[in-house]
Amino acid sequence: MDKTDIKSMNLEELEEFLLSIGEKAFRGKQVFQWIHQKYINGFDEMTNISKDLRQKLEADTRIYGVKEVEKWVSAIDGTTKYLFELYDGHIIESVLMKYKHGNSVCISSQVGCRMGCRFCASTLDGLTRNLMPSEMLDQIYAFERTTGVRVSNVVIMGTGEPFDNYENVLRFLELITHKEGKNLSQRGITVSTCGLVPRIREFAELETAVNLAISLHAPNDDMRKELMPIANRYSIEQIMEACKYYIMKTNRRVTFEYSLVANVNDKKEHAQMLSGLLSGVLCHVNLIPVNPIEERNYRQSTQQSIQNFKNLLEKNRINVTIRREMGRDIQAACGQLRKKYKANHS
């Protein structure tokens, strides 16, 4: 980065910056609104800002964002998968999903990932770098700029572990919900983690209305260690205690994501174990038919197995849904599109 990342500044920092270059503090709100309400790409678009100030901003700062390089649109439901290029040439993925209740965007928080989950393509090449708040924001802003649709929900479930980029994710949340910016409702945002226990507890301390999702994927530690290396650091018991603390602090339910892998974690006994684990906890289970990955020998559970698993959880009074498969005709596991693009352009 050769210039200051102006899009990642909060309003107070922006006002202080403008004072430091001899401008009035009130200009901060104007600049902030141009960036976070108008989604501009360049300072010359700021029509109510003097040319002199625009030149100062151009000299000292940069509006970092994303550039669309490829996209796939589902003919079935309009789901759109994007590959975005960053300022340094790295590629990330984002998905726009259209529902009756509004438009939802799944964004990435890192370039690559170091968590090593066995069923995820995003982690095959490890972690390259964290995304800046500006780069997370612009995945959403780019959708609104190019499609004209209004995004009402955001899930941080794309490439990367959000709590491994904790400070930048917190700044993203501050900016995306700011009343002088997009002003997105906290309740319309979900952060998904594979289970970084200290961060879950820190997040609980914020007493935010942002939703928390846990990538669980196994009902016991032995199985989870096979699927997710993070389980060697934090046990399911530790995760559950952190989740209960989050629920106590926020009075909000936790979503547990459970990817069903054929003959691995989709049997009746696994559903019973999961039911016991979550009994009495304010939570919701999201069953995910796993996407096959060429490099991993995992297959998707049958529809009957998925339904049986759901039925057993419901019988045990666990709130559960099966994730709707969006854009089946352009389906690819998280990280697969980016991986194929890199292979074709290397």
Annotate each predicted stretch with a short phrase:
Residues M1-I92, K244-R253, Y258-S346:
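Auxiliary Fe-S-binding modules of radical SAM enzymes
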Residues S74, S108-S109, S122, S192, ...:
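Short linear Ser/Thr-Pro motifs
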Residues T80, I92, N103-I107, M115, ...:
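Generic beta-strand structural signal
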Residues D88-M97, H101-G102:
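P-loop NTP-binding catalytic core
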Residues K98-E135:
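Canonical Radical SAM [4Fe-4S] cluster-binding loop centered on the CxxxCxxC motif
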Residues T123-N153:
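Conserved alpha-helical substructure of the radical SAM core
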Residues E144-N153, G158-N316, V320-R323:
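Conserved AdoMet/S-adenosylmethionine-binding subsite of the radical SAM
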